Amino acid sequence: MSKAYFINKVLATTVVGSYPVVKAGGLKSLFDPLAGAVETAVADQIGAGIDIISDGQVRGDMIGAFAGKLPGIKGQEVVGKIQPAASAISVADTKYAMTKFPKVKGIITGPSSLAHGLHISTPMYRNKEELALDLAAALVVEARSLEAAGVALLQIDEPILSTGIADLAIGKQAVEMIASSVRIPTCMHVCGNIGNVIDEILKYNVNVFDFEFSKNQANLDILSRRDLTGRMLGYGCVDSTTDEVETVPEIRKRIEKGVEYFDPKILLIDPDCGMRMRTREAAYWKLKNMCEAAKEVRLAL
C-alpha cells in the first residue's frame, strides 16, 4: 500500500485532534493534573469507534502547547533564535495512546500558524516568514520523535493558510521541511473556506489534505473540480463549533455527498476541526454518530 493509502479500510474515521479537557482527581493528578484528561480523551475516542485516534491534545491550545517548550520563545513573545525543544513535546501522551490503541496520529502545530500566533520581540527575525522557517526546523525534531514512537500518521495543523494572511510559498517550504523529514504518511489540516488558496495548497507535498465540509459546504464544489493526484482527503463532516449533536442520518447524508464527488477509498471521515471547546458529552456523541454514519455508508457501497 502506498503512503497515500496507509489504512486498509474504506471511509476510515479519525479526529482532527483536540478533545475537551476532563480533569480527574486522585493521587495521579497530584503528579500530573492532566493525566486523567489524556486517559479520558483516548478512552472516549476508542469508545466512539474512531479508527485513528489522537492523544486528545489536552495540554494547551495549539500555540501554547508547542511555543511553551521551544527555546527562543517566552509566553507568546519570540525573544531569541528558535531552537528545538530540549525533550519531545507530545510524545509521552502519544505513547500512552498507543498503549491503548494500535493506530494513533501524531500532531504538530504548523510553522506558519505558530509564527502568526506569536509576537516577534527580537531583531533576530525580520518577519513571520523567517520565523516560520526556523520554527519548521525546530519542529522537524518533534516530527522525527513522533515517527520513532510509531505513529501511523503525522498531521501538521495549518489553519492560518485559509485566511490569506500567511505567505503560501513560505508555508509550503516550511511544511515540506517537516513532511520530508519523516517516512510515514503526512497530513495537513486547513480549516475554513479554501476557495482563494486551494490551487496553492494542493501543491504542498503531503499525503492527505484535511478540510472542513460541514460548515463550509462550498469546499466540496471547490475540491470536486480539482485533481488530488493520488492524495487522500480528510473529509470534515461534523460541525466542531457547536454542542448540538448531529444525528446519524444527518452525518450519513454529508458523507454520501462526499462519496458522490470522490472515490470513497480516498476519504478519511472526521470532524471539521478540533473538539477542545465542546462539552465532553457533545464531543463523544458527535464522534460516535459520525462513526455509525460512516459504517452505514460503508456497508451500502
Please place each PLM-identified region on the residue numbering.
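Domain-level signal for soluble alpha/beta catalytic cores
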Residues: M1-L301
